[in-house]
Design a protein with these regions (language model features):
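Glycine-rich nucleophile elbow surrounding the catalytic serine of serine-hydrolase chemistry
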Residues: 116, 204, 222-234
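Catalytic histidine-centered segment of alpha/beta-hydrolase-like enzymes
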Residues: 481-491
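Alpha/beta-hydrolase fold nucleophile elbow
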Residues: 213-225
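Conserved alpha/beta-hydrolase "acid-adjacent" motif
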Residues: 455-460
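Alpha/beta-hydrolase fold active-site neighborhood
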Residues: 295-443, 489, 538, 542-545
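Catalytic-loop region of hydrolases
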Residues: 2-12, 23-169, 203, 292-295, ...
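A catalytic-pocket lid/entrance helix-loop region that shapes and gates access to the active site
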Residues: 153-164, 232-296, 344-355, 359-365, ...
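Short beta-strand/loop motif that positions the catalytic acidic residue
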Residues: 442, 447-450
Length: 545
């Protein structure tokens, strides 16, 4: 069977509407690594009503495989006051295919923040080797505030959800007003809940779920933002982390403004690589026979589109659109070149293919969510801001003037995307975090997996996480393109990760693999789709982790 890359699934998707399965059951974990981090730190048995409940599993929907089961458990909104308001946590499972060989449970997270994880067991069932399916019950959750787990909303319009905005002197005042309005609307619609939609609380939910399932430890496969969730879990509950695979990693020290800014920093070497790639194939693509000439061709088209937007298949594409789209596209030079050639054709009045622009204008996946009945249309964006602003409000300046200065400076340093990354965001007007940021510095063993050319979590980000997790090992895929590594059909990476999941033994030292032509071709193919064939969850979201 042809394998497809199980890349980070960064968008809400309800293309297959999951019938709500309402079971009010939960449990509390045993003592954690510290009283401050443990749900069981509650006094006087306040979590007893959770510990005595059990999930009531039911088939998720008639059209889904019978083994794909769903339930809903209850968790405290505020772990400091577990006797107060409770919220739903939607969970799913596919049980081990070899009960006699079962090791435990493998929880997964697709990324985001704001990505639904309830469908992950279905995707993993198709992609993981049979030996792993025998070893684990596959567990999925919609993190708190997301999807079926008491979804939050800010009642944002589609225009208000558009948050990667280039800096322009003449529009900055409007951008500040937009950022303030988003923060105000979020407070108005979900103010009582949003302060508790954080990664630390989601990690506590994961540990509570571990106890509900009757497991002493939990294994984990997290992509992109999911690597940060996994790292925070190991910090709060190091003794309960079993086999942790962190694919396409976030640097905890840069959560979250620094990670957005890393999109701009990481794009510059990728852009230079692209100009060299295109120049070496000038006879095919005609963009210039030296990197300098390709660079000039690119910026000339940006300038033309800023003066007169390019019209293609009903789209009007500005120079800012080209810069923003190219930021992610250049990490796959072939896809970027093909897309740019079509833009140039359209600008020159020639017939062009809008389909080839998919690598350029990849969907954030909100379309399916807008058709859903029970999930607010802006849920992914609302939950994204709750986490990105609420995890570490200290990372976000409060003075709009600081954003203006940073955007101007970073556009100079990183001309492709610097102003997009550093300009004003709603976090400037967000309430202060209820807890301090999580410093990840522990000895829980984890396996970090990272492509060299990743548009969302650059290689230095994974290297930083590897340094913070003292007993971790890292698999680096030299020449690897795309966001998300495992499984990819690459014998080196797949063998290392699967071996760890099956045995629990980390490699003796960090591992370096080389990308294969097939795995990079799949990355390019996936980049040009809005969703992976056969998956209910869209593949790409260029404005998420």
């Amino acid at each position: 069977m042809r394998r497809r890359r199980l890349a980070p699934l960064l968008a809400v998707s309800l293309t297959a509407t999951l019938a709500p399965v309402l079971a009010t059951s939960t449990a509390a974990p045993a003592a954690a690594s510290s009283a401050a981090s443990s749900p069981s730190a509650a006094k006087g048995g306040a979590l007893d009503r959770y510990t005595k409940q059990k999930p009531k599993w039911k088939r998720c929907e008639a059209a889904a495989p019978a083994e794909f089961q769903c339930a809903t458990i209850k968790v405290p909104l505020d772990y400091r006051a577990p006797g107060g308001k409770r919220i739903d946590l939607a969970i799913s499972r596919i049980s081990s295919t070899g009960p006699g060989k079962r090791h435990g449970v493998l929880l997964s997270n697709p990324g985001g923040p704001g990505g639904q994880g309830i469908y992950m067991p279905l995707a993993l069932q198709e992609e993981l080797p049979e030996a792993a399916l025998r070893k684990y019950d596959l567990i999925g959750i919609d993190p708190r505030g997301v999807g079926r787990s008491t979804p939050v909303t800010c009642d944002l319009t589609q225009e208000e959800e558009n948050w990667l905005r280039p800096y322009k002197k003449e529009t900055f005042t409007k951008d500040v007003a937009w950022a303030r309005k988003v923060a105000d609307k979020c407070r108005e619609k979900s103010g009582a809940v949003l302060p508790h939609i954080t990664t630390r609380n989601t990690a506590r939910d994961v540990d509570l779920l571990r106890a509900v399932l009757g497991e002493k430890k939990i294994s984990y496969l997290g992509y992109s933002y999911g690597t940060y969730l996994g790292a925070v879990y190991t910090q709060l509950f190091p003794g309960r982390a079993d086999r942790f695979v962190l694919d396409s990693a976030v640097d905890p020290a840069r959560a979250w403004r620094g990670m957005v800014q890393w999109w701009a920093e990481g794009a510059e070497p990728a852009f230079d690589r692209w100009t060299g790639w295109a120049a070496a194939r000038s006879e095919t693509y005609g963009l210039g026979d030296t990197p300098k000439k390709v660079d000039r061709t690119f910026w000339e088209l940006v300038a033309r589109a800023d003066e007169k937007p390019i019209e293609l298949d009903g789209l009007l594409i500005t120079g800012d659109d080209i810069r923003g789209g190219m930021r992610g596209a250049v990490f796959s030079p072939q896809s970027a070149t093909e897309a740019f050639v079509e833009l140039k054709k359209a600008a020159d009045g020639e017939t062009a293919s809008a389909k080839k622009l998919a690598a350029f204008t990849g969907s954030a996946g909100t379309g399916a969510a807008r058709e859903a009945v029970e999930v607010p249309q802006d849920n992914m964006t609302a939950s994204f801001w709750a986490v990105v602003c609420g995890d570490n409000s200290a990372a976000w300046p409060r003075n709009p003037e600081r954003y203006r200065q940073d955007a101007i400076a970073d556009k100079g340093r990183y001309p492709l995307f610097g102003d997009f990354a550093s300009s004003i965001k709603p976090c400037a007007f967000w309430n202060r975090s209820v807890e301090p940021a999580t410093q990840v510095d522990n000895k829980a063993g984890s396996l970090i997996v990272q492509n060299e050319w990743d548009s969302q979590t650059p290689l230095p980000s994974a290297q930083a996480l590897n340094k913070g997790l003292k007993r971790s090992r890292m698999v680096t895929v030299l020449g690897g393109e795309g966001h998300g590594v495992y499984p990819s059909g690459n014998a080196c990476t797949d063998g290392t990760v699967t071996g760890y999941l099956l045995t629990g033994k980390l490699p003796a030292r960090d591992v370096t693999c080389r990308a294969t032509a097939e795995s990079n071709a799949e990355a390019r193919e996936n980049q040009q789709r809005e969703e992976i064939p056969g998956s209910p969850i869209p593949e790409r979201a260029p404005d998420r982790f």
